[in-house]
C-alpha cells in the first residue's frame, strides 16, 4: 500500500479499531474481486457466508455462497433486486468476514465502531451475537425497512448547513407531528445524510443545487433514522429480543447511542434506535482514540467511513492514526 511520508508503516499498526459501515456504501463487485485475490479474505468469506447461509435456508432466501463466490457472481443491481433481505445479509456477512481477515492479519481489534446497520456486524464480530443470530437480526431489520417509506440523500456540507437547507426547502415539519425531513447521519464536517419522504427530499435536493451543495440520493428504497418509523422500530426490537447475547470480546461504540455499549444495555431497543434516532460518527471516532489505536480499518467493502474517519481525526490530531479501507485499496498488505 502506498503510504504518506508521515504515516506509520504496517508493522506499527497496533491496537487497531474496526469501523463497521451502514448500507450506503456496499459494493458486491469489490467483495468478489478481493475474495478471489486475497487468500485470507477468501477463507473468511467462505466461513462466514457458510454460517449466514444456514439463515438464508431457514428464511427462504437464495444461498449466498454459491452466488457470491461462484463463477457468475451477481451485480449490485441483481443483489438489490433479489428477495428482501438478501443484500442486507450479503453486507452483514461481508463486514464480519473482513473483520475476521483483518483480525488474522493484524490482531483482534481494541474496539469497534458501528454505524447504523453496521452495529449488527460490529456486535457479531465482538461475539455478542452468533453469526447466525446476527444474520437473523439483519434479515429482521430488512423486513422492518420494508415498512419505512421514503429515502435518504447525502449532502456535501456540514450539519449546520444541512439544517439550513431543510428550512429553506420548507421540509422541517410544523410541530404537529414528525418532521418531513431530518438529519439522519452526520459522517463528518463535510458529509451529512438526510431522511424523509421522496417528494420532500426532492425539494431539499433542489435547495442544495441552488446553493451549489452536492446532493446524491442513496440507492436505498427506504428511509431510516427518522422519528416517524416508531412502529417498525418496535417490531424490530421484539424480533431481536429472541436472540441470546454474550459478553463482548472487545468494546463496541455506537454512532446512534453516542457511546460504548455496556452489559446492562437493552441491545434490542438500542439497535431499534437506528430506525428512529440520528447517527453521529465524529463523537464515537474521538471516543475510540482512548484505546490509542495505531490504525483504523473499515470493515466493509467501501471507503466512505474511512474517508470520514480521516477527515475527523486529522482535524483533532497531528499526526492522526492511519486509516485504511482494505477492500478499496488494491495494494493493501494483507
Q: What do the predicted segments below correspond to?
A:
Residues 2-168, 172-176, 214, 218-220, ...:
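FabD-like malonyl-/acyl-CoA
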Residues 149, 185-193, 219-222, 247-248:
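Short Gly/Ser/Thr- and Asp/Glu-enriched loop/turn motifs at secondary-structure junctions
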Residues 159, 196-201:
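Helix N-cap motif at beta-to-alpha junctions
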Residues 166-170, 201-211:
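Short amphipathic alpha-helices in soluble, non-transmembrane regions
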Residues 173-176, 210-211, 243-245, 313-319:
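Short helix-capping segments at alpha-helix termini
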Residues 179-184:
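A short linear hydrophobic-aromatic micro-motif
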Residues 213-299, 303, 307:
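Acyltransferase
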Amino acid at each position: 500500500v502506498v503510504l504518506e511520508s508521515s504515516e506509520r508503516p504496517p508493522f506499527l499498526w497496533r491496537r487497531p479499531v474496526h469501523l463497521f459501515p451502514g448500507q450506503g456504501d456496499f459494493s458486491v463487485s469489490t467483495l468478489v474481486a478481493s475474495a478471489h485475490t486475497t487468500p485470507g479474505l477468501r477463507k473468511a468469506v467462505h466461513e462466514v457466508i457458510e454460517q449466514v447461509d444456514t439463515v438464508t435456508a431457514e428464511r427462504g432466501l437464495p444461498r449466498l455462497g454459491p452466488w457470491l463466490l461462484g463463477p457468475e457472481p451477481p451485480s449490485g443491481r441483481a443483489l438489490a433486486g433479489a428477495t428482501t433481505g438478501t443484500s442486507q445479509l450479503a453486507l452483514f456477512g461481508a463486514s464480519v468476514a473482513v473483520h475476521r481477515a483483518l483480525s488474522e492479519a493484524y490482531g483482534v481489534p481494541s474496539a469497534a465502531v458501528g454505524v447504523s446497520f453496521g452495529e449488527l456486524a460490529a456486535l457479531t464480530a465482538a461475539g455478542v451475537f452468533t453469526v447466525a443470530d446476527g444474520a437473523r437480526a439483519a434479515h429482521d431489520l430488512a423486513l422492518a425497512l420494508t415498512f419505512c417509506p421514503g429515502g435518504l440523500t447525502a449532502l456535501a456540507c456540514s450539519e449546520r448547513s444541512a439544517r439550513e437547507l431543510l428550512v429553506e426547502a420548507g421540509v422541517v415539519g410544523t410541530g404537529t407531528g414528525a418532521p418531513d425531513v431530518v438529519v439522519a447521519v452526520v459522517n463528518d464536517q463535510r458529509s451529512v445524510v438526510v431522511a424523509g419522504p421522496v417528494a420532500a427530499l426532492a425539494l431539499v435536493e433542489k435547495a442544495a443545487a441552488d446553493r451549489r451543495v452536492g446532493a446524491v440520493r442513496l440507492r436505498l428504497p427506504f428511509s431510516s433514522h427518522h422519528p416517524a418509523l416508531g412502529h417498525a422500530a418496535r417490531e424490530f426490537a421484539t424480533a431481536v429480543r429472541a436472540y441470546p447475547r454474550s459478553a463482548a470480546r472487545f468494546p463496541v461504540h455506537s454512532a446512534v447511542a453516542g457511546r460504548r455499549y455496556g452489559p446492562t444495555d437493552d441491545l434490542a431497543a438500542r439497535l431499534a434506535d437506528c430506525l428512529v434516532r440520528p447517527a453521529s460518527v465524529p463523537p464515537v471516532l474521538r471516543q475510540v482514540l482512548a484505546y490509542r489505536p495505531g490504525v483504523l480499518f473499515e470493515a466493509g467493502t467501501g471507503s466512505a467511513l474511512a474517508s470520514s474517519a480521516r477527515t475527523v481525526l486529522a482535524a483533532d490530531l497531528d499526526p492522526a492514526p492511519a486509516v485504511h479501507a482494505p477492500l478499496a485499496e488494491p495494494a493493501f498488505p494483507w
